[in-house]
């Protein structure tokens, strides 16, 4: 609601986002659980896209977040990990979650919590399988007001998300997503 109160169109985003993220730095730092850092402008970690026609906002961490947060202890806070393709309908009185992508996850040894020693400590002698995380392209399918929609984790209306819609009908998607 903090963002969509003032920014509801692509034009608003273009004209207002730079000043908005500076004006609301303290609120954004708190929202992203980064109060323990000296990060001056946490708004640079947050990206979003707007689908004006459907009244949707898609939230995602930015490339800058990906590059900077590995070097900050506790930088990948839980809200930032979950802010990976979150889609809200902002036409409702309180923004309503429509879809959420996969939570951010990491390669083995990419963060201290994902070292093999940390995994052994966490899981003990229980057997677990660790696989390499391959880079790829995430398409997020979701139903909104009876319509099958698709996006990437950071943008509406991309070529790949439009092409992805040709793979399913709303009925088929509903059938396999149950």
Model regions: which residues?
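Active-site-proximal "nucleotidyltransferase
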Residues: 1-135, 153-169
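Short, intrinsically disordered, charge-balanced linker/junction segments flanking boundaries
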Residues: 173-178
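Short beta-strand scaffold segments in enzyme catalytic cores
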Residues: 139-142
């Amino acid at each position: 609601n903090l963002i969509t109160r003032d920014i509801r169109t692509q034009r608003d985003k273009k004209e207002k986002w730079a000043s908005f993220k500076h004006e609301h730095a303290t609120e954004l730092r708190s929202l992203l659980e980064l109060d323990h850092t000296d990060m001056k402008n946490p708004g640079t970690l947050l990206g979003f896209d707007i689908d004006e026609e459907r009244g949707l906002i898609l939230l995602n961490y930015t490339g800058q977040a990906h590059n900077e947060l590995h070097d900050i202890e506790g930088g990948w806070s839980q809200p930032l990990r979950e802010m990976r393709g979150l889609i809200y309908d902002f036409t409702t009185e309180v923004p309503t979650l429509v879809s959420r992508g996969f939570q951010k996850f990491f390669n083995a040894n990419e963060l201290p919590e994902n070292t093999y020693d940390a995994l052994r400590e966490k899981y003990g002698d229980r057997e677990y399988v660790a696989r390499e995380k391959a880079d790829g392209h995430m398409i997020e399918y979701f139903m909104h007001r009876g319509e099958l929609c698709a996006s990437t984790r950071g943008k509406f209306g991309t070529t790949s998300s439009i092409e992805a819609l040709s793979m399913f009908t709303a009925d088929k998607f509903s059938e396999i997503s149950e």
